[in-house]
Amino acid sequence: MGTNEWHVERRDSIGTESPVAREVLETGTLSIVVLGASGDLAKKKTFPALFHLYKQELLPPDEVHIFGYARSKISDDELRNKLRSYLVPEKGASPKQLDDVSKFLQLVKYVSGPYDSEDGFRLLDKEISEHEYLKNSKEGSSRRLFYLALPPSVYPSVCKMIKTCCMNKSDLGGWTRVVVEKPFGRDLESAEELSTQIGELFEEPQIYRIDHYLGKELVQNMLVLRFANRFFLPLWNHNHIDNVQIVFREDFGTDGRGGYFDQYGIIRDIIPNHLLQVLCLIAMEKPVSLKPEHIRDEKVKVLESVLPIRDDEVVLGQYEGYTDDPTVPDDSNTPTFATTILRIHNERWEGVPFIVKAGKALNSRKAEIRVQFKDVPGDIFRSKKQGRNEFVIRLQPSEAIYMKLTVKQPGLEMSAVQSELDLSYGQRYQGITIPEAYERLILDTIRGDQQHFVRRDELKASWQIFTPLLHKIDRGELKPVPYNPGSRGPAEADELLEKAGYVQTPGYIWIPPTL
């Protein structure tokens, strides 16, 4: 069955779902299985997210049990001890924190086994079934959530084992869902092959392709900002916007992950998933409703409107010292920096360059969206010298939204200066804990909300955009230029930004408000 045939009716949003509907969705036992339980992703992200949901009483202990599965031969207590330091500070933890962790870890059980053998998965199924029998009521159903914190190379075999041995067996309802992590392939062909292999085992509503950027607070805020504020509606188009930047910067290199990173590079690692998802939310048309399929339909339309990438609108870089890592080949052509211009061929965005930039070992760590507006026509204040209006969404660190605008310089003279209107989340929402991305996305999976997950046709359209460029890099037809660690990246990237029309404000630095 084709992906586009799935239009699952789900809730409009967490906030508008009725208590009755939510109760129906969460009836019965819930078994959460973390495959790859001894790996870094599981220890640093998956289990801490589950713990935070538990603390918020969103994983009731009388319904939920958590299973770790991996090849390592360790006991339940050994896994619990490994996880403990990731859940609570080693020093200074309060008695309440220690008690919460102890109670949570009692819900965690470990099963050891290979990823391609029925024996291990039948043992896992036996353990899950025993939990369901002990915790289920006569009226309840059983729900099974499998989180694959594993390399994509083992997805097909693991999914086959789940399908063969571990599916929900309750006659009273329930479900089986599978969460898979990026990267979803290396190019269009491998992504489609992976999608086909998983798609032969599970239907699209059972598959949750997780991209943690879609769980970030300000990424989720994009739809609200765009479609719930009237003053943006007439401005959000090529008549008023000159260019859009989507930026991901890290101030550290590969840090011991050189061998792994070299297989993918900065483009595969960041751009077709995280940054392209952000682009979709910036550029999409208003969906018919907040139902997941309506939102994802609009995102696919954006992706299918992106023109082929031009070689002269790409700058690749590799920081000096990258190949000093013994796990990286001396002649590696892998980029650690990339700036590319994407152009959307539709009525709203014709002529507006979307500048997508990602890099490692740069002079700062941040992720942000910068929407730069055109110059004021007939400007009587000569404010062009001060810089353009920009709407900036800071995704990390120090989540914030601010608008750069020109105002009168305080004093006796009529002179203009650039300032900002800003919303700093740390200042405005003191005392409110902003959930981590994985918390939101795991909860969405439990609730059956696929709004913030990648559909198969989205994945295909994303790879169609970048596969030709990636193949040219793989063949050595495009080569990265060297840049100094701790710099802005290659000078050629700044030249490309200027060519695309981005105007830098000289000397302007946004300073987050202090608490």
UniProtKB/Swiss-Prot annotation:
Enzyme Commission number, as recorded: 1.1.1.49
**Broad enzyme group:** oxidoreductase
Q: Which cellular compartments is it found in? A: Cytoplasm, Cytosol
GO CC terms: cytosol
Q: Which pathway does this chain act in?
A: Carbohydrate degradation; pentose phosphate pathway; D-ribulose 5-phosphate from D-glucose 6-phosphate (oxidative stage): step 1/3
Does DNA repair count among this protein's keywords? no
Where is it mostly found? Answer: cytoplasm
Q: Which residues bind NADP(+) 1?
A: 36-43, 71, 155, 182
Indicate which residues the UniProt annotation says bind NADP(+) 2. 357, 366, 370, 394, 402-404, 422-424, 488, 510
The record's PROSITE patterns line, in alphabetical order, gives: G6P_DEHYDROGENASE
MF terms from GO for this chain are: glucose-6-phosphate dehydrogenase activity; NADP binding
Q: Which domain of life is it from?
A: Eukaryota
Gene Ontology annotations of biological process type: glucose metabolic process; pentose-phosphate shunt, oxidative branch
Q: Tell me which InterPro entries the record gives.
A: G6P_DH (IPR001282), G6P_DH_AS (IPR019796), G6P_DH_C (IPR022675), G6P_DH_NAD-bd (IPR022674), NAD(P)-bd_dom_sf (IPR036291)
Family under the similarity heading: Belongs to the glucose-6-phosphate dehydrogenase family.
Summarizing the function annotation, the protein's role is: Catalyzes the rate-limiting step of the oxidative pentose-phosphate pathway, which represents a route for the dissimilation of carbohydrates besides glycolysis. The main function of this enzyme is to provide reducing power (NADPH) and pentose phosphates for fatty acid and nucleic acid synthesis.
Subunit structure as annotated in this protein's UniProt entry: Homodimer.
User: How is this protein named in the record?
Assistant: Glucose-6-phosphate 1-dehydrogenase, cytoplasmic isoform
